[in-house]
Amino acid sequence: MPPAVSSETSTIVPQQVIVHPLVLLSAVDSYNRSAKGTKRRVVGILLGQNNGDVVNVANSYAIPFEEDEKNASVWFLDHNFMESMNEMFKKINANEKLVGWYHTGPQLRPSDLEINNLLKKYIPNPVLVIIDVKPKSVGLPTNAYFAIDEIEDDGSKSSRTFVHLPSSIEAEEAEEIGVEHLLRDTRDASVGTLATRVTQQAQSLQGLGQRLTEIADYLRKVVDGQLPINHAILAELQSVFNLLPNIFSGPVVSEQALESEAQRAFNVNSNDQLMSIYISSIVRAVIALHDLLDSLAASKAMEQQDIKPTVQNGEVSANAEQKA
């Protein structure tokens, strides 16, 4: 399906908007800090990449925004703050460009078109993403929109309106790990059960198995000549393989021999680790016993010499008393 084009400006309308979890977390955090418990909404800027068909929203930041609840046409947006933030984000990551703006809605407002027109001075084709910070049903908390000029059939003056765009939540592997840790830390510990923990471990192992399968398929296609050799990817894989323990030192003879050798190497490694822990415990016990014997000897010597112990700077010292 070819991408849609707005009539007056000949602007390509994006076909999909991808929102990363970091954007959702930033919007919720800004809402909880400044607008929680009120009817106010939070407005912010979206950063990422726009290749025409797909808008990838990877980062965001909130901006000062005020509006009159009774009169929707009265609002204030601090564009000076936005300009200063843009300069700082350029220094952090030059690949993240201004792609649009967001607010916490949860629906379109009458002033959204005016705000969108203002932001066009800084963003050529801004995308609006409404983030529902308090969703009442299960589903995506985002709705994406794009402003176009709609021409009437009777030839009258065109009107500007928002069209809905498909949106999705996608994350890179590092973001997935971060979100999993965040959910694990915020989840009520009393609710967790053994079945829940086992399920989480099974899902993690399933994800790891899927990644390993993808790597094996890629290497197989490279060997068969279906894909070109990418030395950067091979270098990354080699660095991963170098972290694995060197289990086999001799020639490989059979699968059964491999299993027995792997089991033996694993047992030896486990025994070495347990031995290190055991020796460390013995050393700590000997040191503690040595300190105890020193303390007893010093105390006995003080009693025999009628020396009164004093403590200075955490150290025991003795001052002898003169006998009459």
UniProtKB/Swiss-Prot annotation:
Transmembrane feature ranges: none
Molecular function as annotated in GO: metallopeptidase activity
Cellular component terms (Gene Ontology): cytosol; mitotic spindle midzone; nuclear envelope; nucleus; proteasome complex; proteasome regulatory particle, lid subcomplex
Pfam family, one: JAB
Family classification: Belongs to the peptidase M67A family.
InterPro entries in the cross-refs: EIF3F/CSN6-like_C (IPR024969), JAMM/MPN+_dom (IPR000555), MPN (IPR037518), MPN_RPN7_8 (IPR033858)
This protein's record includes keyword Phosphoprotein: no
Domain MPN: 17-151
Gene that encodes it: rpn8
Superkingdom of source: Eukaryota
PROSITE patterns registered for this protein in UniProt: MPN
Entry keyword set: Proteasome
Protein name stated in the entry: 26S proteasome regulatory subunit rpn8
Keyword Glycosyltransferase: no
Function in brief: Acts as a regulatory subunit of the 26S proteasome which is involved in the ATP-dependent degradation of ubiquitinated proteins.
GO biological process: proteasome-mediated ubiquitin-dependent protein catabolic process
